[in-house]
Amino acid sequence: MIFDKEDFESFDPELWAAIHAEEIRQQQNIELIASENIVSKAVMAAQGSVLTNKYAEGYPGKRYYGGTEAVDVVENLAIERAKELFGAKFANVQPHSGSQANAAAYMALIQPGDTVLGMDLNAGGHLTHGASVNFSGKTYHFVPYGVNSETELLDYDEILKIAKQVQPKLIVAGASAYSRLIDFAKFREIADSVGAKLMVDMAHIAGLVATGAHPNPLPYADVVTTTTHKTLRGPRGGMILTNDEALAKKINSAIFPGTQGGPLEHVIAAKAVAFKEALDPEFTTYIEQVIKNTQAMAEEFAKVEGLRLIAGGSDNHLLNLKVLDLGINGKEAQDLLDSVHITLNKEAIPDETLSPFKTSGVRIGAAAITSRGFKEVEAKKVAQLVSEALVNHDNQEKLAEVRKAALELTRQFPL
C-alpha cells in the first residue's frame, strides 16, 4: 500500500499524532541545539523518495545486486559534489552517521589497542574520540588532551608534549563543543613529529569549512570525517574524505563490508541535494550570517553577571556558557528553557565538577535559527530571552513573559 498524508493519518493516528506534535514543537520553539538544523524541502523530498526501496550493497559499478543503474547515478552525484565542495580527491558518502564514519576511519588507520590522542569530552570532544563508554575507548587506547585551564583554548604545546610522551599511532582533531578556530597545520606538525596519522572530525564545522569560514583540514589530515547535517544542513548521515588513494581503498573496505551492509541510497540522494545547495553562493551568505548571529548572542551573554562564555566567545557556529554561578546547573537550565519554548542542551565545561547528567554549562548554536531567517537583531533578542530565563529561574511571572516573547518570535519566522 502507498499512503498519502490523509491515508497515513487515518491508518496510524498514534504515529501521525507524534509526528505532528514534533512539527508543532519545531514551529514554536527557538532551536539552539548546535547539532541541529532545518533542511530544505528538496532534501526531505529526496530522503522520502522511492530510493528507500532499493538495496545496493557495494559501490557504484561494483554492486552485489542488480537494478542499480539509477542509484549508481545518485551515489556518484553525491561523491562528485562532496569532492568539489571540500577539495577532496576521494569521498565515501555511505556512512549512516558520524559515529560510523569515525569507526570506519579508525579501522582503516589503526589496529585495536593502538594508542590514539583525542580531545577530552569535558574540553569539547566527542564520545567517539575515546570516551570509555564508547566503542572507541573500548577498542583503542585513547589518551585525552584538553584545553588550557586559563584561556580554555587548545594548548598545542601541551598536546605536543603529550604526543611525545605516549607516541600515538593516530591523533584525532575536531570537537563537538569547541567554539574557537582549530589550527590543523599545528596538528599536522605534531603528528609528523611523532610519526602519527592525523584524522580530523569536522562534523560540527563542515558547513563553515565548505564556505571558507573555517580553515579546511583536507590539506593537512590523512582522513577527514564529518556528518552531513549540523552546519552542512543536509540529512542525518556521515561521510569520509581523503586525498590518499591507498587510504581511500581501506576506507571503502572499512565501510563495506567492514562495518555496514546496504547503503541508504535515499539518504545519499538527500546528501547530494545538500551538497548542491552548499555549492551555491547563497549558502556562503547563510554561513556568514550564522557566524554573525553567534557573535551577536555572545555579545549579549557577555553583559550578564553570573554567566560566563567558555573560551571567551566564539569563532564558529556555537558557544558554551557556564550557568552554575546563577544557582542552576546545565540540566536544570535545559529543562527550564524548554518550558519557555527555547531548546538547547546541557554541556560539560573544562574542569567540570558535576556529572554528565547535570553539567555546569549549556551549549548554544545559531545554525537552526539562521536557517529560519533570524539575523543579528533576533539573535540578540534570543540571547536576552535565554539570559532573562536563567537569571529569573525561580520567577514564574518573568518566565511567563519569556515564554510569550519566544512564541511571538517564532510566529514571525515560520518554518
UniProtKB/Swiss-Prot annotation:
Gene3D superfamilies: Aspartate Aminotransferase, domain 1 (3.90.1150.10), Type I PLP-dependent aspartate aminotransferase-like (Major domain) (3.40.640.10). (6S)-5,6,7,8-tetrahydrofolate binds at L121, G125, H126, L127, S355, P356, F357. It is an enzyme of class 2 (transferase). The record marks H229 as: Plays an important role in substrate specificity. Its EC number is 2.1.2.1. Signal peptide: none annotated. Disulfide bonds: none annotated. The modification N6-(pyridoxal phosphate)lysine is found at K230. Pathway: One-carbon metabolism; tetrahydrofolate interconversion; Amino-acid biosynthesis; glycine biosynthesis; glycine from L-serine: step 1/1. GO terms for cellular component: cytosol. It is found in: Cytoplasm. Its cofactor is pyridoxal 5'-phosphate. InterPro entries: PyrdxlP-dep_Trfase (IPR015424), PyrdxlP-dep_Trfase_major (IPR015421), PyrdxlP-dep_Trfase_small (IPR015422), Ser_HO-MeTrfase (IPR001085), Ser_HO-MeTrfase-like (IPR049943), Ser_HO-MeTrfase_PLP_BS (IPR019798), SHMT-like_dom (IPR039429). Catalyzes the reversible interconversion of serine and glycine with tetrahydrofolate (THF) serving as the one-carbon carrier. This reaction serves as the major source of one-carbon groups required for the biosynthesis of purines, thymidylate, methionine, and other important biomolecules. Also exhibits THF-independent aldolase activity toward beta-hydroxyamino acids, producing glycine and aldehydes, via a retro-aldol mechanism. Belongs to the SHMT family. PANTHER family: SERINE HYDROXYMETHYLTRANSFERASE (PTHR11680), SERINE HYDROXYMETHYLTRANSFERASE 1 (PTHR11680:SF35). Homodimer. This is Serine hydroxymethyltransferase. The gene is glyA.
